[in-house]
Amino acid sequence: MTSIAEKWQKEWEKAKIFEANPDRTRNKFFTTVAFPYPNSPFHLGHGRTYVTCDIYARYMRMKGYNVLFPMGFHYTGTPIIAMADDVAKGDKELIDIFKNIYEIPDNVISKLADPLFMANYFRDEIKKAMKEIGLSIDWRREFTTIDPEFSSFIVWQFNKLQEKGYIVRDTHPVGWCPVHHIPVGMHDTKGDMEPEIGEFVLIYFNSDLGILPAATLRPETVFGAIGIWVNPDVTYSIIELDGKKMIVSERAAFKLTFQFDNIKNLGSIKGSELTKYKAVNPITGKEIPIMAADFVDPNVATGIVMSVPAHAPFDYYYLKKNKQQDMQIVSVIQVEGQGDTLAKDLVEKTNPKNKDDLQKLTEQVYRIEYNKGKMKDVSSLVKPEFVNYFKSFIGLSVPEARQKVTEFLIEKGLGRKIYEIMNRPVYCRCGNEVVVKILKDQWFLDYGNPQWKALAKKLISNMKFIPPEIRKDFEFVTDWLQKRACARTRGLGTPLPWDKKWIIESLSDSTIYMAYYTISHKIRQYQLKPSQLTYDFWNYIMLGIGDIDKISSETGISKEIIREMRNEFLYWYPLDIRHSGKDLIPNHLSFFIFNHAAIFPEELWPKAIAVNGFVLYEGKKMSKSLRNIIPLRKALRIYSPDVVRIALTSTADMGSDVNFSDSYAKSVGEILRRYYEFIKELPKYDGEGSEFANNWLKAQVSSIVLSSTKNMDNIDFRSTINDILYSFDSYLREYIDMCKADGKEPNGKLLREVIETWIKLLAPFAPHFAEEIWHELGHTTFISLEKWPTAEESSEDLYYILIHEYHKRIIEDSQKIINYYYKGKPSIVKIYVAEQELMKVLREAVQILSNGGTLKQLMEKERPSDKKLANIIRKIYELAVELDDNMKKLILGYNINEREILELGTKYMSYKLGIPVEVYDVSKLDKSKYNKEALPLKPAIIVE
């Protein structure tokens, strides 16, 4: 099938069918997907997001929309430079991956040390992969983020943001590369991890050696601190900070130099030596021991932790382990319905086996006490001079107490805040661990600006999200998002217009580039120079602001061209949907929302975001260490493009991870081949079929068209593929069996119509295969441009579907009886149907149940004259409870005669069971011989 794919890709390109131009007679649909960093070839994991976007674009194109699906390449920032540096350094692991996984020739690998060569080489590789997998892209609009023309657009964007007060120069904590001395964001790190910065509160515990600054996320528990933990196997540094002598881990001493200017290193001491000393709780004034614990991580905060066993499972566990649990445990937080010592109680109850168990308990205690905890009266625990202040703490919630304690400690000089990478370790692409730096005089996008947040929230409230549950993720990110460094001193990209020593970083120049796609090809077509693309030019194109005569005169661009570009922008904008992976929600996608809200009027705000999960290979995450990275182009050669497209999008819903497996991919290829063979044999079917079978098949096809359309609208590709690839296959087989059972040849004309409908439904997923079949059926048009099938809900269609479903139920029940009671082959199946008047009772029972009613209501309505009839009504009610949805639809929607509908299917039932089937009224049943009864839709089945 790979050769078929190559054939149709050439035909599409030759016919330019995916080049989209404004057409005022048609509704437009503008879709984009995050453009890639060309710092390595695509692997299977990349494929899902891009194919998802393409399938939806193809679907909307077949729905009659004028679809624009463009593509560019993201050269900005450090990802490319860092990768090129690794090649230049001779990174063995990277070179091995390039050579043995991606099969890059040695003579090319040596050239990849040049960042621009790398970017251009991998751009070409990625572009080939995109074409080979069948993405329906308008390549005229391609650009890179270091094109001077695009840079002029970014300069305009940043000037607009500064005008609005959304760019500020400030001091703020940022993720930082300690080697290259630049801020680090998600796309600057290995594994694309966003450094999550959090606050620790340092509490100063005095000792004879100096201050032990215990780092905590829970300063409100300091009243219950009965000891200090240090790691005995670690070397600690003695430093001077703010004129105070302090003891912290060596790693902490290094990291704190990025947050404070006034640090001096005075010496070192082993953790085991520290345990010979005592410390003083600065709030209670009590002397407490310094204790050894190997759970203390010297890489987290200061490497010094206070021991609060009443509220920290680790602390109680290690006291117990060290046989120190008799130390007085001080509880300061009360949770209604829980004991005073929640941490202790949970440790005793669950008996944790390892640090992972303890971590889970810690998170549980933290969550319960944070959400439900109230402060006890702590005034009796504190120094006399603090009593009056802390008297007011009784009854405070934990969040309130946390804030007040933090403020008190800082005000009294008993503590301070520091910052830490909460999801550590995070590594810069250069290989060094990221730290937090308090960055001074840095340029920030002020996402914490209340006015800007309000605009972003308004945009989110009017947006569609797929899957819908991600809306809350965007709302959460919008709430916590604050200042973000928007420029670097290293990397490729656009200089900050008012401070050119800074380069705008990669997550800041990729927020509104979708607007640039609308006119990028016009810039190329009219050979416009970067110098012509001024602030006023962009202001007019994007916002309609300015005097066109003046702009034309100043730029040398004709008014006709300017108007044409403005009109093209207005035709395509706003963006209808943005596709991406779920990892970009907390950064790129949220910044995309903020920047659109800041710059464009509401009518040009994006309409929807679709986010998909990741791709596993054989159930495991693809990684260098597992050596299971599968290059996309290699997968396309092995399985074919259409098989890969289906396998990447059909085994999970949008928000979940897809598992790409060799066996499933091969099974997809096999079913496509089976369809192909069936279609080749269509000419041999020249009969008329049976009336019931024909009507049933048409009904099933209409049902699939309706469900597929609904599922495609919601980007539910898993359900769609299940319908059009698997259900459709079973319906075709069943139809042929139904015709055979009736002694009729299948209707060839009907089968051709059905196949033509099916191939249109499949076209967005397997466009190359669909084009081939479409043309083999004698068509000369591109199926990619055909109309998506339509259908209307029909009670008649549903009737045929439900009746046949009932026939299959009878077959299933009969087969169970045969399998259970007969070793040999029986001679006949006799079906005895209940009295027709009982059908009305069943209908009443189903209606009552659907309204939440009971058996009592059914009895009151039917008023049985004797116990025997009452017993039958009770059994009918119980049957109604057990009925599946299809049988409920049948009983409620149609005035059926059970015997007649069963007689419609006797030939089919006989064919499937391999023995004659006869239908009788229950009055014909010999009760002396068979102790059976018949209920409506549950006839008595006798096998002889």
Curated annotation (Swiss-Prot):
EC number: 6.1.1.4
Motif residue range(s): 'KMSKS' region: 621-625
Catalytic reactions of this protein: tRNA(Leu) + L-leucine + ATP = L-leucyl-tRNA(Leu) + AMP + diphosphate
Spans through the membrane: none
SUPFAM superfamilies the UniProt entry points to: Anticodon-binding domain of a subclass of class I aminoacyl-tRNA synthetases (SSF47323), Nucleotidylyl transferase (SSF52374), ValRS/IleRS/LeuRS editing domain (SSF50677)
EC top class, as a word: ligase
Secretion signal span: none
Record localization: Cytoplasm
Chain residues that bind ATP: 624
Alphabetical list of InterPro entries matching this protein: aa-tRNA-synth_Ia, Leu-tRNA-lgase_arc, Leu-tRNA-synth_Ia_arc/euk, M/V/L/I-tRNA-synth_anticd-bd, Rossmann-like_a/b/a_fold, tRNAsynth_Ia_anticodon-bd, Val/Leu/Ile-tRNA-synth_edit
UniProt keyword annotation of Aminoacyl-tRNA synthetase present: yes
Entry keyword set: Aminoacyl-tRNA synthetase, ATP-binding, Cytoplasm, Ligase, Nucleotide-binding, Protein biosynthesis
PANTHER family assigned: LEUCINE--TRNA LIGASE, CYTOPLASMIC, LEUCYL-TRNA SYNTHETASE
NCBIfam families for the chain: leuS_arch, PRK12300.1
Family: Belongs to the class-I aminoacyl-tRNA synthetase family.
Protein name from the UniProt record: Leucine--tRNA ligase 2
Underlying gene: leuS2
